[in-house]
């Protein structure tokens, strides 16, 4: 049974927003401080990524561990939709469990499909989890994002080396700059 009344639960759930969340603001400020520029919630791209860095052809999704099922796996051995919680960052509620399991499963499937579409369009995707932005891990996570973005840029802008076609022995004879053999 739920510990909160129906009205209290409704109020809590209504207060949850999908834009300008605390984890998203941490990532935005961290990237801005490191010199990265981005657009927010790009409507024309699948999944409306939280941050879009066009220069790097990269989309960043800042996901809440609960809503996107971080470290939640489904037990394929069971015929029913049994869920295995493998970390503390995503605990499935005991009340209305079937609803939450299905909701999180659909969210994970949707996320995977959106990232597949973005990859097909030539975009790179980075997912940042809410638990990776805890104070003890925050700087390491932000440095990792910056490193990944720089790596992507270097890969996409490395010089292209073109191999020249092989030539026949006859074609390779160089013209003489001096006089030929004197007889």
Regions found by a protein language model. Give the residues of each.
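Nucleic-acid endo/exonuclease domains
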Residues: 1-127, 131-183
């Amino acid at each position: 049974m739920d510990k909160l009344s129906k009205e209290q639960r409704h109020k809590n759930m209504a207060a949850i927003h999908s834009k300008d969340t605390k984890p998203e603001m941490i990532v935005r400020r961290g990237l801005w401080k490191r010199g990265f520029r981005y657009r927010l919630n790009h409507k024309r791209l699948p999944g409306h990524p939280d941050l879009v860095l066009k220069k790097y052809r990269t989309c960043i999704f800042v996901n809440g561990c609960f809503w996107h099922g971080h470290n939640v796996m489904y037990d394929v051995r069971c015929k029913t939709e049994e869920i295995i919680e493998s970390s503390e960052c995503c605990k499935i509620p005991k009340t209305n469990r079937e609803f939450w399991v299905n909701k999180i499963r659909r969210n994970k499937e949707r996320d995977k499909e959106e990232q597949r579409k973005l990859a097909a369009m030539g975009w790179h995707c980075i997912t940042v989890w809410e638990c990776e932005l805890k104070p003890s891990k925050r700087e390491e996570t932000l440095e990792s994002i910056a490193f990944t973005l720089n790596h992507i840029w270097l890969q996409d802008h490395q010089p292209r080396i073109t191999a020249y076609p092989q030539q026949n022995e006859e074609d390779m004879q160089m013209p003489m700059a001096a006089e030929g053999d004197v007889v």
